[in-house]
Design a protein with these regions (language model features):
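Conserved positions within compact, well-structured domain cores
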Residues: 21-223
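Sec/Tat signal peptide C-region and signal peptidase I cleavage site
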Residues: 15-19
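Single-residue recognition of alpha-helix boundary sites
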Residues: 13-14, 135
């Protein structure tokens, strides 16, 4: 009987340790991440850039900008000169601006990297598609904030608040849905890709780059 009790205690301690490793990992700056058990090994942050808790909306960023601001519009966007056909970076079409054929954000233009450090980045399209297709999405509420609970293959869950996006005015219907920037753009349109969710669930979509949207960092640890 004593041996059985000892085995049970050891097992419970091991499970507790495993749970802590899944849910409570953090870097030296206390930026926390969660292991959802995804095939790629991608680890997702537990909160948005600029947030103080998982349900906090955090800051809003135009694509390729690293600081929040009050107005999100073509006239305030860093990588154009005030019009759709005046792109100065991340452009593959001469009719849209200066061609450089860049389709992935440089680290200096990555809001996750600049605000959280070099081990963090904005997710790629592949990482977002993996989150969409490999996880279970469920509309939920955390501390009164609407959003989605995303449960990975290993049963671990993270929360994405429905923060919508910002433009040149106040946000209407906040809590209805969300849009999270990726690090990638097709280059041939004045929009970039990201993860969107709402009443219809989660999907990959494009949005004008100058819009202010949420950023959820990712990292991949060496195995």
């Amino acid at each position: 009987m004593k041996n059985l009790v000892l085995i049970m205690l050891v097992t419970m301690m091991a499970l507790s340790t495993e749970a802590n490793l899944i849910e409570n990992r953090s870097d030296s700056n206390d930026h926390r991440w969660i292991d959802l058990g995804l095939p790629s090994g991608t680890l997702w942050a537990t909160m948005n850039v600029g947030a103080s808790s998982p349900e906090d909306y955090g800051d809003y960023f135009a694509w390729g900008e690293t600081s929040p601001k009050e107005v999100y519009s073509l006239s305030t966007y860093k990588w154009c000169k005030g019009a759709e056909n005046t792109q100065t970076k991340y452009c593959s079409d001469s009719e849209l601006g200066i061609v450089d054929n860049k389709k992935t954000l440089d680290p200096d233009d990555d809001a996750a990297t600049i605000n959280w450090g070099p081990s963090w980045s904005m997710p790629t399209e592949a990482q977002m598609q993996e989150l969409i297709t490999r996880c279970n999405w469920k509309a939920s509420t955390m501390k009164g904030v609407k959003g989605y609970s995303v449960t990975g293959p290993n049963g671990a869950t993270m929360f994405l608040p429905a923060a919508l996006c910002r433009g040149d005015g106040p946000i209407d219907d906040i809590g209805w849905g969300g849009f999270y920037w990726s690090s990638e753009s097709p280059g041939f349109i004045d929009a970039s890709g990201g993860l969107t969710f709402g009443e219809a669930g989660a999907s990959w979509a494009f949005l004008y780059r100058f819009g202010g949207c949420s950023v959820r960092p990712v990292r991949v640890l060496n195995k």
